[in-house]
C-alpha cells in the first residue's frame, strides 16, 4: 500500500519566463538524507535542509550568465559542481561564499547533465551523446569531445544507475517523431542504441524513469495518450551491435490524453505520476501500484505546475505556482489481499495509528450490552484490576506499554486481555502486545513470560508476518513446545525458519526434550518407541506372513534386489520396527513434516544441515514410511499426522540436498539400501495395481445383454 502525507512549502521560486511560470532545473541530493540542492532556471543554486525548510547556503553566477545544468554534489570529494553557459564548469565547497572565485574549467563541448553515484567519479554527459569521467576532463578541459548522436537528434531525458557497483548511463533522444534509447556501460566500455517504437501512434513521450534489477534495466515512459509503458533491456546483452528496434508494452492506463506530465519510479512495485489535462485547470499527483495496476493515493493541485517531479528520501518535490512543495509518501510491500483491503499482515506503521481495545468496555462498564452473567464477570474483572492497581503499577491501564511491568503482572494482564475476544480490535491488540513482549524479551534476557506467549499464540490470530521476531525468540530460548505451537498456528512460516526449527528439534538434548510439555497421546497410537540408544531395531515374530500388506514384505525385498547380496540377509519373518527417536522428539519433527513449504525455497536451507542430522532424520522418515505401509487399512488418528506423500517428499528433498554427503558416510550404506529396496517394492506394487486397473476398465466397457428374470445368478470372472 502507499499513502501521501500533507505537503509543505520548501521555498519560493523566481520567475524565469515571460509567461510567469516558475521552473527549476533540478533538485538533487546533497549528501545527507535531509538536504537537497535546488537549481533554479535563473542564476542561483541553493542548499536546503528539508525538515527545517531553511536554506543552508546559496550561490549565484554573475549578471548575464545563466546556469544550464543542475548542480550536483560529488560524493567522493564533498564538492558541488555546476555548469553555466553550457561549457563552463564551476567546482566549490560548501564553505565558499562566492562562486566567482570557485574553480573554473571551460570545456570544448556543450554539457547536457552531470550524473553522480556513491563511490564513483562524476560522469559528464555532453549534448552530442558522449560520456566522460570528470577527472579525465579536468586533466585536459579542451580535449576533443566526440559525437554519438545523429543530426537533429537531441537528448530529452537522462539518468544514472548502478549495476553491480558499476555506473550505467541511460538517456532518451528525440529525432523528429522518433525516439531512441542509448545505454552506456563502462566495464567494459560500450554503447548500445535502441529504436523505441511507441505503443500507440501519434503519441509523444512526456517523461521517463527507470530502474535496474537482476541485470535488467526497465524503462518507464509516460505518453501523451495517457499510457505508462515499460520496456525491459537486458544489461548483460548490451554490446556494440547495430541499432535494434524495441517496443514499449502498456503498464498503466491513466485518464485520457494529457498535455504535460512527469513520472518517477519509487520502488519495484510503485510509481508516482504528475499529470494535467486540458479539460481541467488543475493537476493530479498520484501513486500507482504497477504490480496490480491500482491507484494507491492521489493529491490534486488547484494551480498549474511545471510538470516536474523529483523523488529523494521518501519525499516528492513538485514546483507548484511560485513555490517548491514537498510531499512525503509511504510505500509498503503489497500483496493482492492488501490491494483489496483484506490483508491480515498488519505492518507496525499501520498499528501505531489504529484505535485499540476500549478498556472501559472490556472491564464491563456497559451492562446494557452484556449478557445475563455480565455482572459476575464485571466483579471478577474489577477485582483483577484493583489487585493489579494495588501492586503499584499504572501500566496495566495502558497495555501497550509492557516494557516496565513485572512478569507476574504481564501474565495477569494477558489473561485479562483474552476476555475481550469478541472485540473488533482483538487481533490488532494481540499483535501489538506480542510485539511489545518480544521487544522486551530481546532487551532483557531474564524476562520471558512463557505462559503469556502460549495464551497469545493459542488465540490463532498471530502470524509470522505480523510478528516476525517471535519465532526467532523461541529458537533462541530453545522453547520447543512454543515452536511446535507456532508451526501449527501460523500459516506463513518462511522456509528458512522452518529449516531452523527442524535443526533445533533434531539437535536439542534429550534432557530438554523430555522436560518439555508435549502432548504425545495421539503419537503413541502409531509410534513404537524401543531402545532409544540403538539406531534401528527389529524384533521377530514367530509366524510367517500370510499375505503381502500394501505390497511390502522383507521376502519381496530380498528377491527383487538388484544390488549384490549382503552377508546377513533379512529374516524371512514379519519385522516390527521401533522408532529411532523418542516419542516427544517425533511429535516435534512431525510438526515440521505437515507444515506448508515451497520446495524451491526450502532446498537451499536443507543443505546447511550436518551429516549426523541428515542420517538421524532419514532414519526417522524411513521408520514412518515403513510404519504407515504395514497395513493399508490402518486409520491414523488426528490432523497432526504426516501423510505418506509428505514423508516421501521430505525424504526426496533430503536426499537431493545431501546425496553426495550421504554416500560418503560409512553408516549410510545399509540405510540407503533399505530405502532403495522399499521404493522398488512400492514401484512393483503400483505397477501391479495399474495392470488391475486396466483390466477393470476393460470389464467396465463390456456391455452385457439385459436379462429379465425373477431369479438371480452369480457370475465368477477370472482375471488371471
Curated annotation (Swiss-Prot):
Cellular component GO terms held in the UniProt record: nucleolus
A GO BP annotation: positive regulation of transcription of nucleolar large rRNA by RNA polymerase I
Domain of life, source organism: Eukaryota
Keywords tagged on the record: Activator, Nucleus, Ribosome biogenesis, rRNA processing, Transcription, Transcription regulation
The UniProt record lists the keyword Transport: no
Pfam families on file: Nol11_C (PF20998), NOL11_N (PF08168)
Region (Disordered): 365-392
Keyword Transcription: yes
A GO MF term: RNA binding
Record's subcellular location: Nucleus, Nucleolus
Protein's job: Ribosome biogenesis factor. May be required for both optimal rDNA transcription and pre-rRNA processing.
Protein name: Nucleolar protein 11
Native species: Xenopus laevis (African clawed frog)
Amino acid at each position: 500500500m502507499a499513502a501521501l502525507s500533507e505537503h509543505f512549502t520548501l521555498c519560493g521560486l523566481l520567475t524565469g519566463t515571460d509567461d510567469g511560470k516558475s521552473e527549476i532545473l533540478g533538485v538533487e541530493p546533497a549528501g545527507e538524507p535531509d538536504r537537497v540542492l535546488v537549481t533554479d532556471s535563473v542564476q542561483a543554486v541553493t542548499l536546503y535542509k528539508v525538515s527545517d525548510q531553511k536554506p543552508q547556503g546559496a550561490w549565484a553566477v554573475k549578471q548575464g550568465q545563466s546556469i544550464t545544468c543542475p548542480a550536483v554534489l560529488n560524493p567522493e570529494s564533498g564538492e558541488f559542481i555546476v555548469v553555466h553557459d553550457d561549457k563552463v564548469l564551476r567546482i566549490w565547497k560548501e564553505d565558499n561564499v562566492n562562486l566567482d572565485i570557485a574553480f573554473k574549467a571551460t570545456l570544448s563541448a556543450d554539457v547536457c547533465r552531470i550524473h553522480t553515484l556513491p563511490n564513483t567519479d562524476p560522469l559528464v554527459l555532453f549534448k552530442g551523446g558522449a560520456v566522460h569521467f570528470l577527472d579525465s576532463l579536468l586533466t585536459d578541459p579542451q580535449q576533443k569531445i566526440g559525437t554519438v548522436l545523429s543530426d537533429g537528434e537531441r537528448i530529452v531525458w537522462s539518468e544514472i544507475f548502478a549495476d553491480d557497483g558499476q555506473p550505467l548511463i541511460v538517456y532518451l533522444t528525440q529525432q523528429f517523431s522518433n525516439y531512441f534509447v542509448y545505454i552506456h556501460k563502462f566495464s567494459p566500455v560500450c554503447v548500445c542504441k535502441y529504436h523505441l517504437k511507441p505503443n500507440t501512434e501519434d503519441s509523444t513521450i512526456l517523461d521517463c524513469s527507470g530502474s535496474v534489477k537482476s541485470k535488467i534495466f526497465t524503462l518507464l515512459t509516460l505518453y501523451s495518450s495517457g499510457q505508462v509503458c515499460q520496456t525491459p533491456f537486458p544489461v548483460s546483452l548490451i554490446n556494440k551491435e547495430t541499432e535494434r528496434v524495441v517496443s514499449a508494452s502498456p503498464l498503466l492506463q491513466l485518464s485520457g490524453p494529457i498535455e504535460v506530465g512527469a513520472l518517477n519510479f519509487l520502488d519495484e512495485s510503485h510509481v508516482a505520476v504528475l499529470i494535467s489535462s486540458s479539460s481541467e485547470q488543475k493537476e493530479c499527483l498520484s501513486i500507482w501500484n504497477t504490480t496490480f495496476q491500482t491507484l494507491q493515493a492521489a493529491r490534486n493541485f488547484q494551480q498549474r505546475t511545471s510538470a516536474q517531479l523529483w523523488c529523494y528520501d521518501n519525499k516528492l518535490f513538485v514546483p507548484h505556482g511560485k513555490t517548491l512543495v514537498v510531499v512525503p509518501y509511504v510505500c509498503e510491500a503489497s500483496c493482492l489481499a492488501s490491494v483489496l483491503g483484506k490483508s491480515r499482515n498488519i505492518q507496525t506503521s499501520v498499528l501505531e495509528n489504529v484505535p485499540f481495545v476500549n478498556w472501559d468496555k472490556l472491564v464491563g462498564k456497559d451492562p446494557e450490552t452484556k449478557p445475563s452473567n455480565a455482572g459476575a464477570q464485571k466483579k471478577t474483572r474489577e477485582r483483577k484490576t484493583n489487585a493489579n492497581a494495588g501492586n503499584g503499577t499504572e501500566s496495566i491501564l495502558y497495555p501497550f506499554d509492557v516494557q516496565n511491568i513485572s512478569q507476574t503482572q504481564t501474565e495477569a494482564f494477558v489473561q485479562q486481555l483474552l476476555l475481550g475476544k469478541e472485540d473488533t480490535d482483538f487481533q490488532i491488540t494481540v499483535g501489538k502486545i506480542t510485539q511489545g513482549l518480544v521487544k522486551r524479551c530481546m532487551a532483557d534476557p531474564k524476562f520471558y513470560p512463557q505462559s503469556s506467549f502460549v495464551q497469545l499464540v493459542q488465540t490463532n490470530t498471530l502470524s509470522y508476518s505480523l510478528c516476525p521476531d517471535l519465532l526467532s525468540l523461541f529458537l533462541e530460548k530453545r522453547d520447543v513446545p512454543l515452536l511446535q505451537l507456532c508451526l501449527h498456528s501460523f500459516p506463513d512460516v518462511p522456509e528458512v525458519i522452518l529449516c531452523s526449527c527442524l535443526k533445533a528439534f533434531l539437535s536439542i538434548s534429550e534432557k530438554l526434550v523430555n522436560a518439555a510439555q508435549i502432548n504425545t497421546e495421539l503419537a503413541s497410537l502409531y509410534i513404537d518407541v524401543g531402545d532409544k540408544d540403538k539406531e534401528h531395531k527389529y524384533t521377530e515374530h514367530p509366524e510367517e506372513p500370510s499375505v503381502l500388506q500394501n505390497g511390502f514384505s522383507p521376502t519381496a525385498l530380498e528377491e527383487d534386489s538388484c544390488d549384490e547380496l549382503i552377508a546377513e540377509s533379512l529374516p524371512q519373518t514379519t519385522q516390527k520396527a521401533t522408532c529411532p527417536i523418542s516419542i516427544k522428539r517425533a511429535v516435534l519433527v512431525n510438526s515440521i513434516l505437515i507444515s506448508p513449504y515451497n520446495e524451491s525455497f526450502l532446498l537451499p536451507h536443507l543443505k546447511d544441515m550436518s551429516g549426523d542430522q541428515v542420517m538421524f532424520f532419514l532414519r526417522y522418515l524411513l521408520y514412518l514410511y515403513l510404519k504407515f505401509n504395514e497395513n493399508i487399512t490402518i486409520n491414523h488418528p488426528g490432523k497432526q499426522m504426516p501423510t505418506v506423500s509428505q514423508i516421501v517428499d521430505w525424504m526426496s528433498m533430503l536426499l537431493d540436498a545431501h546425496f553426495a554427503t550421504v554416500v560418503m558416510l560409512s553408516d549410510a550404506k545399509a540405510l540407503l539400501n533399505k530405502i532403495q529396496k522399499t521404493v522398488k517394492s512400492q514401484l512393483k506394487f503400483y505397477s501391479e495395481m495399474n495392470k488391475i486397473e486396466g483390466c477393470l476398465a476393460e470389464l467396465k466397457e463390456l456391455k452385457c445383454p439385459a436379462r429379465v428374470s425373477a431369479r438371480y445368478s452369480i457370475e465368477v470372472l477370472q482375471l488371471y
